[in-house]
Amino acid sequence: MTATPTASLPPLANDRFLRACLRLPTDVTPVWLMRQAGRYLSEYRDTRAKAGSFMGLATNPQYATEVTLQPLDRYPLDAAILFSDILTVPDAMGLGLSFAQGEGPRFAHPLRDEADVAKLQVPDMEKLRYVFDAVASIRRALAPAGAPGRVPLIGFSGSPWTLACYMVEGAGSDDYRLVKTLLYRRPDLMHRILEVNADAVAAYLNAQIEAGAQAVMIFDSWGGVLADGAFQRFSLAYTERVLRQLKKEQGGYRVPQIVFTKGGGLWLEAIADSGCDVVGLDWTMNLGAARARVGDRVALQGNLDPNVLFADPEQIRAEVARTLDSYGAPSAGSGHVFNLGHGISQHTPPDSVSVLVDAVHSYSRQQRGAAG
C-alpha cells in the first residue's frame, strides 16, 4: 500500500493507531492487545456471568459494548477492538455454533462431504445484525454527545482458511487431520469452501466498516499449519480475495487493513504484498529482521510473547524495550503498532498490562527523543 493516504483520518482524540497503520508519524508507538477484552479482567467475568453464556455475551450489543470498553477504562490503550468471535460467520451459514463449558467452540453440522459443501453459501448479513449493531453502539460509546472518538475501533474476522478449519473439523484440532484430508483428497471441495468463505468474510467486514469500524483485521490463526505451497494456494490466495473486495475508505476516511498469520514468518514477504496495510507478527519473529525483509511497504504489528506478562515488572519493561529496539527507531514512511504475538492469556495479572502499556508509551517516547 502507498504511504500517502487517499483520504484523511477521522476526528479522534487519539489517532496514533491509525497513523501507525498508515505509516504516518506518531508521538509514541501505539499499543493494543489481542483479546484485550477478556477473562483476565474481573469486570469481564462479571458481565459474562450476567449474560449467562459466551454467545449470550457476544450476541447482545449492550454487553458487547460494555466488555469492549472495559480494558479502555483500565488502561491507556490506543485502540478498541470489537468484542465478538471469529466463528459468527459459519454460524450464520447454519453450522450450529455452540460453546461447551471447558471445551471451546463446536459446530453441530460440520462440512464432511460433497453434499454439505454444495449447500454452503454466503449468509444473509442480516443474520449478523447483532455484530453490526454492536459496532455502532461501541462507536457511540467512544464518542458521546458528538465529541471526537476516544480511540479508533477495530473490526475483525477469521480468514477463509481458518474458518474452513473449524467448519470441517467441527471444533478445534491438534492434528488438522479432517481438514487436511479434504484438502489433499478433494481440493476442489476445499476451494469451493474457501471461495464462499472469502466472499462471506468480505461482505462481513464491509458491513462492519459501514457500521463504524475504523480498521479491520483478518485473523489467519491456523495459516501456519499449512505446508509451503499449500499456504499460498489455500490460505493466502483467499485472504487476497477478501482484501480485493474490502472498502478502502468510508465516509472519506481511510480504513486500514491488518492481516495476522500465526506461524506465517516463512511467507512474510508474500503476506506483505497481499494488499494489506499492516502485517501482524507472532512472537517467534524478530521485528528488526521482519522490517528488513519487507522494508517500509507495510506497517508491522506485534510481537511480544504473551507469557512475558507473567514476569515481574522489571522484566516486562526490559522485554518491551527489547521489542521496540528490535523494530528500531521510527523513520519517515515506517509504522509499528505494539501488540502481543498472540492473544492475552486469561491467567494474566491485570497489573502486568498496566506495566506493559506504560512501558511501551514511555520507552517509545524516549526513542523518538533520542532520534530527534
Curated annotation (Swiss-Prot):
Q: Which reaction does it catalyse?
A: uroporphyrinogen III + 4 H(+) = coproporphyrinogen III + 4 CO2
What is the predominant subcellular site recorded for this chain? Answer: cytoplasm
EC number(s)? 4.1.1.37
* Pfam families assigned to the protein according to its UniProt record, in alphabetical order: URO-D (PF01208)
Q: Where is this site: Transition state stabilizer?
A: D85
InterPro entries assigned: UROD/MetE-like_sf, Uroporphyrinogen_deCO2ase_HemE, Uroporphyrinogen_deCOase
* Keywords attached to this entry: Cytoplasm, Decarboxylase, Lyase, Porphyrin biosynthesis
Where does it live in the cell?
A: Cytoplasm
Coiled-coil segments on the chain, per record = none
UniProt-listed GO biological process terms: protoporphyrinogen IX biosynthetic process from glutamate
The molecular function GO annotations come to:
uroporphyrinogen decarboxylase activity
Q: Name one GO cellular component term.
A: cytosol
Which residues take part in binding substrate?
R35, Q36, A37, G38, R39, D85, Y166, S221, H342
Pathway(s) annotated for this protein in UniProt: Porphyrin-containing compound metabolism; protoporphyrin-IX biosynthesis; coproporphyrinogen-III from 5-aminolevulinate: step 4/4
Quaternary assembly: Homodimer.
Q: List, alphabetically, the NCBIfam families matched.
A: hemE
Describe the function of this protein: Catalyzes the decarboxylation of four acetate groups of uroporphyrinogen-III to yield coproporphyrinogen-III.
- Give the family this protein belongs to, as stated in its UniProt record: Belongs to the uroporphyrinogen decarboxylase family.
Give the protein name, as stated in the record.
Uroporphyrinogen decarboxylase
Q: Which organism is it from?
A: Methylibium petroleiphilum (strain ATCC BAA-1232 / LMG 22953 / PM1)
